[in-house]
């Protein structure tokens, strides 16, 4: 184990130590000689100074200040000393004093003389006061009727540019006769143009017509969501409630409305989730339906907020939650399919016919054949019903089969094959040619050469209902 050395602290200067430790007697041995000038170098200079004069050279153990007189430069003449003289002050103007004016300046102006007081007037009369009484015969009535004044009425008209009241035009009496001529400056003959109308919605289209006036060229492929990346944690959810109510796995709340095809966000809280696999989930992205390993899979990406920094940034892993809805079984395991009859007969006594039976061994239930002519077509007298239990006489119609195109002839109990084929006019077969895949009916366009440069790519697995976050 390597020992760690303590950091070295710088000691105070010798001058500071000498001030505090000289009186206490705790100074280090190198402080007092350095301050008092009793070091070995100082003693050597003192001993050598007894025989050699070194004054004025500034040789010593102190700072290099050149002694009391300073360093004297060698060589060169001395420069004249320049004394800076400041600007001269303006002179003080002294006002002259005349011979008749006093030399003493008075500080307070002269004021008028104030009398000490006026004499008190004297009254002459009898003893006491004289009282005089009087009675008024006129009642004190105040006239409160206001005086008639002049009233001035003024009016001001202000026009508001935001609202101008439309003026009211008084209808005037006009002429009612039949000779009224109206002429305008734009009167004249105007021509018109016939524009042919085109049908935009055609029933004979191929379905590949562009739906906009400027279609986007090329083929745009939507990249499949990378749900099985190494950066995602794979968690399987066995509860089918994950499809309809995914929030029940994150929080204990039961919202009234929860969209199942959108991204769900949750507030980060310290409470424990109902399902431990959904702990610290703050977002569940839109679902995606995929097919993987023979099953239909329902997937959602979840974002966790395991850590939160002081700046507010949340850090967490991305988890892929998936639930297998149903397995996809191959057709080889279910080759035998039992077919149920769509119509059942209520009459079990009706005879059944075998379409592969020999017509010679079938009991004769038909009437003699009718001759066929090209101009007449026999019509049956009664309709033949296999499931009919009514005993009625039936008549079959013989229709000759044409063998010009080498059609296969089938026989059965209800199909009669004639022994001699009628004579039909022979028609030459149409010439067989190999039709190309693309037929060009004109020379006013050409195929885009870039079609031949498109390479086939590997077919990817189909994905549906993925949002932007899942796709990338």
UniProtKB/Swiss-Prot annotation:
One Gene Ontology cellular component annotation held by this UniProt entry: viral capsid
UniProt KW keywords: Capsid protein, Cytoplasmic inwards viral transport, Disulfide bond, DNA-binding, Host endosome, Host Golgi apparatus, Host nucleus, Host-virus interaction, Late protein, Microtubular inwards viral transport, Phosphoprotein, Viral penetration into host nucleus, Virion, Virus entry into host cell
Subcellular locations according to the entry: Virion; Host nucleus; Host early endosome; Host Golgi apparatus
Motif annotated as Nuclear localization signal, chain positions: 1-12, 453-461
InterPro entries referenced in this protein's UniProt entry, alphabetically: Late_L2
Any one GO biological process: symbiont entry into host cell
Major localization class: virion
PTM annotation, UniProt: Highly phosphorylated.
Annotated disulfide bonds: 21-27
Example of a GO MF term: DNA binding
Family statement: Belongs to the papillomaviridae L2 protein family.
Function summary: Minor protein of the capsid that localizes along the inner surface of the virion, within the central cavities beneath the L1 pentamers. Plays a role in capsid stabilization through interaction with the major capsid protein L1. Once the virion enters the host cell, L2 escorts the genomic DNA into the nucleus by promoting escape from the endosomal compartments and traffic through the host Golgi network.
Subunit details: Interacts with major capsid protein L1. Interacts with E2; this interaction inhibits E2 transcriptional activity but not the DNA replication function E2. Interacts with host GADD45GIP1. Interacts with host HSPA8; this interaction is required for L2 nuclear translocation. Interacts with host importins KPNB2 and KPNB3. Forms a complex with importin alpha2-beta1 heterodimers via interaction with the importin alpha2 adapter. Interacts with host DYNLT1; this interaction is essential for virus intracellular transport during entry.
Name recorded for this polypeptide: Minor capsid protein L2
Lineage, uppermost ranks: Viruses, Monodnaviria, Shotokuvirae, Cossaviricota, Papovaviricetes
Encoding gene (name): L2
């Amino acid at each position: 184990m390597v020992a760690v050395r303590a950091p070295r602290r710088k000691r105070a200067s010798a001058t500071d130590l000498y001030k505090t430790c000289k009186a206490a007697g705790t100074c280090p041995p190198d402080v007092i000689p350095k301050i008092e000038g009793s070091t070995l170098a100082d003693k050597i200079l003192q001993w050598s100074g007894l025989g050699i004069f070194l004054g004025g050279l500034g040789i010593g153990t102190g700072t290099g200040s050149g002694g009391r007189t300073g360093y004297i430069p060698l060589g060169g003449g001395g420069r004249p000393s320049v004394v800076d003289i400041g600007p001269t002050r303006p002179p003080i103007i002294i006002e002259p004093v005349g011979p008749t004016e006093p030399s003493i300046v008075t500080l307070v102006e002269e004021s008028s003389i104030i009398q000490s007081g006026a004499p008190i007037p004297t009254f002459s009369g009898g003893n006491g006061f004289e009282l005089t009484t009087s009675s008024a015969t006129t009642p004190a009535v105040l006239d409160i009727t206001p005086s008639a004044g002049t009233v001035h009425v003024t009016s001001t008209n202000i026009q508001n540019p935001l609202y101008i009241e439309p003026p009211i035009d008084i209808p005037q009496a006009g002429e009612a006769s039949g000779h009224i001529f109206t002429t305008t400056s734009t009167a004249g003959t105007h021509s018109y143009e016939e524009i042919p109308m085109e049908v935009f919605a055609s029933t004979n289209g191929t379905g590949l017509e562009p739906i906009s006036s400027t279609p986007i060229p090329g083929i745009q492929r939507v990249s499949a969501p990378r749900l099985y990346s190494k950066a995602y944690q794979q968690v399987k959810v066995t509860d089918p409630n994950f499809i309809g109510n995914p929030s029940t796995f994150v929080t204990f709340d039961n919202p009234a409305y929860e969209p199942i095809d959108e991204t769900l966000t949750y507030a980060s809280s310290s409470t424990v989730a109902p399902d431990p696999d959904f702990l610290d989930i703050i977002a569940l992205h839109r679902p995606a339906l995929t097919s993987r390993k023979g099953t239909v899979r329902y997937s959602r990406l979840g974002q966790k907020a395991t850590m939160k920094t002081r700046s507010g940034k949340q850090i967490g892993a991305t988890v892929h939650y998936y639930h297998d809805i149903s397995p996809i079984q191959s057709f080889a395991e279910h080759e035998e399919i039992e077919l149920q009859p769509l119509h059942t007969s209520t009459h079990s006594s009706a005879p059944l016919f075998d379409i592969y039976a020999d017509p010679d061994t079938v009991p004769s239930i038909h009437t003699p054949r009718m001759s066929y002519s090209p101009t007449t077509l026999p019509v049956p007298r009664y309709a033949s019903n296999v499931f009919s239990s009514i005993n009625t006489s039936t008549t079959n119609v013989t229709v000759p089969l044409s063998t010009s195109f080498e059609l296969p002839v089938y026989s059965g109990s209800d199909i009669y094959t004639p022994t001699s084929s009628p004579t039909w006019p022979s028609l030459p077969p149409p010439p067989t040619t190999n039709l190309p895949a693309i037929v060009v009916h004109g020379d006013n366009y050409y195929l885009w050469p870039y079609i031949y440069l498109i390479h086939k790519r590997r077919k990817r697995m189909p994905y549906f209902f993925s949002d932007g976050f899942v796709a990338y």
